[in-house]
């Protein structure tokens, strides 16, 4: 042990080349480097997200006949799908009940509702913007603007 200590001191001062027992192990390990396989590869791949993805939005059209269909309409709004609802062919009391229920749902979901015609409404979730007055657009341009 004292010989090892003296060898280390000589190496530290620079008088002697220090040989450690661990060098033998390192030489053996050098030969093994070629055969080493990593246990787990942690390659970080950059995820590329296209900002300009065009997702096709679907508009759901409902012509309800009973109030039991109201939760289904709200489910579509919760799934961020715009809904067109036609309340023309149901009783006025039921239509008012539908309108009040859907108006509350639109308010809770921070959406938008707009009247298109008598008894026909567009309900849009907060990710869909309804710009302009559709009723005025239909009066001015008609249903098919190219057929003026």
Curated annotation (Swiss-Prot):
It comes from the Bacteria. One of its GO terms (biological process) is FtsZ-dependent cytokinesis. InterPro entries: Cell_div_SepF, Cell_div_SepF/SepF-rel, SepF-like_sf. It is found in: Cytoplasm. Keywords: Cell cycle, Cell division, Cytoplasm, Septation. The keyword Acyltransferase does not apply. Signal peptide: none annotated. Belongs to the SepF family. Homodimer. Interacts with FtsZ. This is Cell division protein SepF. It comes from Alkaliphilus metalliredigens (strain QYMF). The lineage of its organism: Bacteria, Bacillati, Bacillota, Clostridia, Peptostreptococcales.
């Amino acid at each position: 042990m004292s010989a090892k200590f003296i060898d280390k001191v000589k190496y530290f001062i620079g008088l002697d080349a220090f040989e450690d027992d661990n060098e033998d192990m390192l030489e053996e390990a050098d030969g093994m480097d070629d055969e080493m396989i990593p246990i787990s590869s942690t390659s970080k791949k950059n995820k590329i997200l296209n900002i300009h993805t065009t997702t096709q939005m679907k508009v759901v059209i409902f012509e309800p006949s009973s109030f039991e269909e109201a939760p289904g309409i709200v489910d579509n709004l919760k799934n961020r799908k715009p809904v067109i609802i036609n309340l023309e062919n149901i009783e006025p009391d039921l239509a008012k009940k539908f309108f009040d229920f859907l108006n509350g749902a639109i308010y809770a979901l921070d959406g938008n509702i707009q009247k298109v015609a008598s008894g026909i409404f567009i309900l849009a979730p907060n990710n869909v913007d309804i710009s302009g007055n559709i009723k005025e657009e239909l009066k001015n341009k008609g249903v098919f603007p190219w057929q003026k």
